[in-house]
Amino acid sequence: MSGRALPGALALCLAGLLAPAPALAHHGSAVVGMAGPEGPGAALETTSPIPLPRGALFLMVKSEWVPYRQFDWADPENKTYSLFDTLVAGYGFAPWLSAYVFLPYNVKAQDGAGTNVGFGDPGVLVSLAFKYDEGFRLVPAKESLDELQDWHFSVFGLLTVPMGPTIAATPALEWYAPDMQTGFGSPSFQLGLSAAKQLDDDLTWLADASFQYFLPHTYPFTRYQFGFETRVNTALAWRVVATPGFRLDLAGEVNFLNLVPDREADGGGSLQPLPASGGTILYGGLGVRAYAGRFSAALAARTSFARWLNDQAAQQGSEGLEVARVALTLSWVLPQ
């Protein structure tokens, strides 16, 4: 497609549209995103494939509050809430190659066990961006507004490094269960693909799919492996206000999450699936994102509207049984 070249400042504002989200099981997820007054919109949980410009530095902080539904059968050990905070730094190494570092900090509260607070496992994510314009090709250094309406894609990979604590204990000096620890104890790997298409001047469609694999970890009290995760997300971002220095978007999303049951060592040391874990969940969410110059702020809420858990009556505090997931995100782009 042809059209006038995208101004440098606008290209920079579009930098943060890339949003490969490390879907950290039981530990929240981080999504980065910005946009300019013109061009494609960014979703809230769904990855966008638009990369960072070469030499651009991206900074983001996200805080996600997750209160859980309380059940009489889980008393006195109901999990009450989790707070997932994430600091993100990204850099554009090439017009088509971006990398991000994620540093999580988690708070997990449970009746009768107190609150466990600590850093999670940091992650490194690399994304390769390409587009379709009379054939597939890497994203060029400059794109016009017309060219930004082409199909855009990215392939991304994530590695988490086991640096978060895994041996925290309750005030009664009992070990927290693996899903109440703030770290995983072993590396995890995620691969994903994202796509975006600007449908008109104000409406952008986005989608992504990813798979995450967790290696087992030996704790002082057990050997445990978190279940594999498959995520498929889709979103519409609608630009409702656009001025030279300000933009306001509304976004609606549907998120699919499939969790393979966690596994724990039996008496003989073999890892066996845990019946009270895993399942399939559908989330729906709405949010608003505002942009002012190089800064962006977003507020979003989502909740599960359908769930098929493997043993729901014993899965209090798991995905799908949240009251809601409410996230606040602040981000900033520094030019080269």
Predicted features and spans:
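Outer-membrane beta-barrel biogenesis signature
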Residues: 23-62, 132-154, 165, 336
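Outer membrane beta-barrel transmembrane domains
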Residues: 64-74, 132, 222-336
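Hydrophobic, lipid-facing positions within transmembrane beta-strands of outer-membrane proteins
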Residues: 42-45, 55-57, 61, 83-87, ...
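Residue-level signature of outer-membrane beta-barrel architecture
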Residues: 50-52, 63, 91, 103, ...
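Outer-membrane beta-barrel channels and translocator barrels
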Residues: 54, 94-98, 106, 131-135, ...
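Surface-exposed strand-loop-strand hairpins of Gram-negative outer-membrane beta-barrel proteins
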Residues: 29-35, 53, 64-85, 171-180
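Outer-membrane pore/translocation modules
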Residues: 107-222, 336
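Membrane-embedded beta-strand positions of outer-membrane beta-barrel proteins
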Residues: 59-63, 101, 126, 153-157, ...
